[in-house]
Amino acid sequence: MNNLITISGKKVNLIANGDLQILNDPWQIFQLNDWALRKDFEMITAGRASQPIPATNKITGVANIFLEEGAVVEHSILNASAGPIYIGKNAQVMEGCMIRGGFALCEGAVLKMGSKIYGATTIGPHCNAAGEIKNAVMFGYSNKAHDGYLGDSVIGEWCNLGAGTTNSNVKNTAGDVKVWSNADNDYISVGLKCGLLMGDYSRSAINTSFNTGTVVGICCNIFVPHFPPKFISDFTWGEERYTFAKILQDIGNWKRLKGHSVTKKEEEILKHLYNQ
């Protein structure tokens, strides 16, 4: 199947086998996640056998559940009747978790005790996740390690949501949610549901409450005594500008917790963006 698409103003002919989805906006990541999970599950598990599912778990839809080598799942409820459940290599589902597919817990990630997961949700590699999560995507090395609600949301890499952080995903009026778009330089309607869109390396303080359709840029440290604004620009420290030296120091601190460090390439990219 040939598809003519536009990338950075240039027409590109893309050849693909099967269904093709083009992501134009970040909120489409969670909107299309159910489709993506099903496609990925089918591709990744084709011709392979799951590791045995321990008998301590309560299982529905066993044919739609796949555990990679080293995955640990004990004393939890897994219901794959509405969508597949994939537990990656060396990932861990702690006791008392309740999971409804579609769901992917990627390599080395941890789902903490008593978590409640609704599809379609993806927890990226080496993330920590807890609380109530619904139709959300967390990219690698990010943490939502405590109670709180995350729904219809996208969290970038190396983010941290403090204990009790919660987002709204539906307006009290049940009307269309408007989200800030850098491309349009304006708020645009994205549908009835949208929670939090957070860029890489950003963090929230404990008990932060995000309004419906909040956009947080990269490298933000959010701690305010009120509801944060619906659009928080890149490199924000509280309500001020983050200094670049402090950004690198804080990112380095968080990366060391997971055995990593800030690379030269990361520093160059962040410095370029900081100076825009």
Where are the model-predicted features located?
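Extended beta-solenoid/beta-helix repeat architectures
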Residues: 48-156, 171-172, 197, 215
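Glycine-rich hexapeptide-repeat left-handed beta-helix
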Residues: 113-114, 120, 126-276
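Terminal amphipathic alpha-helical/low-complexity segments used for targeting or macromolecular assembly
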Residues: 1-64, 70, 225-276
